[in-house]
């Protein structure tokens, strides 16, 4: 496995590229079309366009080629400019324009120019409809879809196989499966072996609608299947949460390709089976298949979520060894993986090596700095993004507000929050409000936090009230906490956390009898409580623990070692469960309850399997509890080890008995 030092060694300077000077062009139409095809950027195309205008050879063919080329160069505005300044209004030019607008995601403009085509009296043909139908499938206008279908009949192109395929796809994607099936049924080609594509499109439509029975029925009825047929149905099962069925179908697949492997890897990652997602990726490599950018992004996502740094480094090494381009998708996935595995410097290095960054890339880096409490770097990165011309969206503001929250930068956080609406016309979501409530609460501004919750334009949810409750508890605002707890109960009286909040509130005031009443109510009404899990990667293998998990092969050794760790911590002042559990449980019961949290089990395995001085890295799906947080601090001081724990909210870097969060999380 490559080390980080090998992966991040300095690169040699790239070779300079020299472009030959422009050559004189003849006024021949075919010659200019050849020049248009040779253009690699918009500047070159503009140069050729200027010569065409000077020499007066802007025919319909040349105009259509100019529009097509500018679309391929991702310059739809230039395509529109060419069209507006050209007198050509024929099917060649309009088809090229509609196609280019569709391929550049200008769907509304594509439909508008189709309508303009009809108004100009230009007859649409079989090359027009597939792209305007695709645009409408993205827009989702059912009435327009039916009107376009009628137009295909009127213009006698409804029997064209490509038009029919586009109709089925459009109806399926706009949720009109009855119409999609009707067009499919009327297709005489569906019984031919070469009609696989229309079958795949319809099966995909039923998969998107979660109608796996109909999708499977169609799959079994196909005259012939290709890898796309298998991959479509596998993805349908994955998206429907039927991962076992997806795996069974994958095993039956005669020729597995990178698409089917990627679908399966992505499915395991999305359903939280990160170990299997990662192992499936390496199994694919052993079979001799080369991953594409989607495969790599999917497996890196699994590494990010589980903290599998070792596997992530191996994947990064594979990318370098095989000369895979560090595009936006792979680069962003690597940045996210390194940041979420606690290797911020590596994330920053990958980020700086990316030649092209989009909003997702910037957000991943800003969020990485933010969750590690690196406020100044997060804000600097945000400003660099603004200087680059990238416009912020609501997600990047979540990252910026997280940075302000984790560093208690109240005034700046409020400025960013106000700037969303005033400067960028972005309406804050519930998540933004929760962060601001947390920000005000952490600073002890309980009145302002409560007022914000009461006056929010969005109805506050449990998370919002819980953020306010934590602030009340931290700043001893018990009377306000009582009121907040009532709001929690009104929202969801059966939620276990609501009762626990009340218990803690009353226990802090010493009202033990009322606590007992609340606890009895809890026992009667609670149905289910989410269990926490933690991951720790050791020797390239992920180890997962759930709360109270005794399934690990080293369970006995872990239990003995955990007792030893807790005993040493108690000698140094650790008080198991104090101020964190319900007040009137016996001390030994408290230790039994709090001693089985998943992060404690992961920590203990880390001590058993790593050398002294090694940093222990743990990933937890829930917010770390106060008791475990306290133990981690004591253990980091006793063992002289760094403990890096990522919970549902942020990173906790325990070192010498202290935590980077400042004991507020």
Swiss-Prot record:
This is Pentatricopeptide repeat-containing protein At1g04840. GO terms for molecular function: RNA binding; zinc ion binding. Residues 464-539 are annotated as: Type E motif. InterPro entries: DYW_dom, Pentatricopeptide_rpt, PPR_At4g14850-like_plant, TPR-like_helical_dom_sf. NCBIfam families: PPR. It comes from the Eukaryota. PROSITE patterns: PPR (PS51375). Residues 571-665 are annotated as: Type DYW motif. SUPFAM superfamilies: TPR-like (SSF48452). GO terms for biological process: RNA modification. Keywords: Repeat. Residues 540-570 are annotated as: Type E(+) motif. Belongs to the PPR family. PCMP-H subfamily. PPR repeats lie at residues 90-124, 125-155, 160-190, 195-229, 230-256, 257-291, 292-326, 327-357, 358-392, 393-423, 429-459.
